[in-house]
């Protein structure tokens, strides 16, 4: 008579999480796409990422390869990414992406401030003086008047651009 196994190979308290094969494939494809994004970066930017030496070398190789060799190398990078923690890599990538959008948002803010200076005059210049106390109030007033005249006459917006350059210079100093 056969004896029944009294004890299971795992502890009953342990919860076993079964992952489907397609879910595993999706995870691997995500890692491969993350690797593709790394390949698209410049080497100077890539040096700032927390990558293992093998992965760094594989990414550098993929940047040199063309067509089919590149595709195979991207698969290799995906495989190497399985042994890496993707969170810090993804965080660094997000930081680089947001850097561009933050710079664009800052320029839009300066453009809006410039428009206010031209349209509202002294009231907006007072706001600029609060933001940038070292700004030359008289120069800003003069440029605002000139920009309004240029706009009215349909001339090129030389003063308009100069106001923006002044505001941009003060923003970069901060």
UniProtKB/Swiss-Prot annotation:
Which one of the record's GO molecular function terms can you name?
rRNA binding
The alphabetized UniProt keywords are: Cytoplasm, Ribosome biogenesis, RNA-binding, rRNA-binding
Name the Gene3D superfamilies for this protein. Answer: PSPTO4464-like domains (1.10.60.30)
Q: Does the UniProt entry include the keyword Phosphoprotein? A: no
According to the UniProt record, one GO cellular component term is: cytosol
A biological process (GO) of this protein is: assembly of large subunit precursor of preribosome
SUPFAM superfamilies reported for this sequence: PSPTO4464-like
**Localization, UniProt:** Cytoplasm
Q: Which InterPro entries match?
A: DarP, DarP_sf
Source species, domain of life: Bacteria
Instruction: Read off the CDD domains from this record.
Output: YjgA-like (cd16331)
Principal localisation: cytoplasm
| Its biological purpose | Member of a network of 50S ribosomal subunit biogenesis factors which assembles along the 30S-50S interface, preventing incorrect 23S rRNA structures from forming. Promotes peptidyl transferase center (PTC) maturation.
What protein family is recorded? Belongs to the DarP family.
Q: What is this protein called?
A: Dual-action ribosomal maturation protein DarP
Source species of the chain: Vibrio campbellii (strain ATCC BAA-1116)
What gene name does this entry carry? Answer: darP
